[in-house]
């Protein structure tokens, strides 16, 4: 598996063994992958590189806007993966900023996303640090995702008192109670989650040029964050 091989390689990249102490597997972002055939910054030719020089693909096409649109060309998606340690019964996302996971590919001289080469027309670095690290701190990421996970846990808790009561009433009234309560009761946890995501975007993220995509749009398979398309240093200056 390329990820584990790169993690164990010696040189500029470093990372722990994927099996901590030989027993417990370490977590890494399952969405990222490595490529060894790419064009380095400042070069014109695509060539093969060693695994230790591989680019780490950490951002992806924005599937939430029409392909070929201006927004599609100017934005990318960073994905925070699902985690299953706490429960298999409700969605839960990684609270780690991509590049800070226990088994992430790291470079000692990098604290933020550092472009190294081009692949498929986009710029990538050689570590697991995604461009999101240029906009959000690890602490901010952790706080926001923990709140999102909290809403999801409550929404999918089948043994909660409210769920048990509503299910019993629905059976007895042929779902009439749910139809009536939908007009009067407070918003559901999933609706509150949508409100929270919108609030975070409006108050904090949109001024930085990024935004959280509603988890509902990804079917809760990943927590997707839209970022500006990364550009090489020469294009920024």
Swiss-Prot record:
Pfam families: Erf4. It is a peripheral membrane protein. One of its GO terms (biological process) is protein targeting to membrane. Its main location: endoplasmic reticulum. Keywords: Endoplasmic reticulum, Membrane. GO terms for molecular function: palmitoyltransferase activity. It is found in: Endoplasmic reticulum membrane. One of its GO terms (cellular component) is endoplasmic reticulum membrane. Signal peptide: none annotated. It comes from the Eukaryota. InterPro entries: Golgin_A_7/ERF4, Ras_palmitoyltransferase. Interacts with ERF2. The ERF2-ERF4 complex is a palmitoyltransferase specific for Ras proteins. Palmitoylates RAS2, which is required for its proper plasma membrane localization. Belongs to the ERF4 family. This is Ras modification protein ERF4. It comes from Eremothecium gossypii (strain ATCC 10895 / CBS 109.51 / FGSC 9923 / NRRL Y-1056) (Yeast).
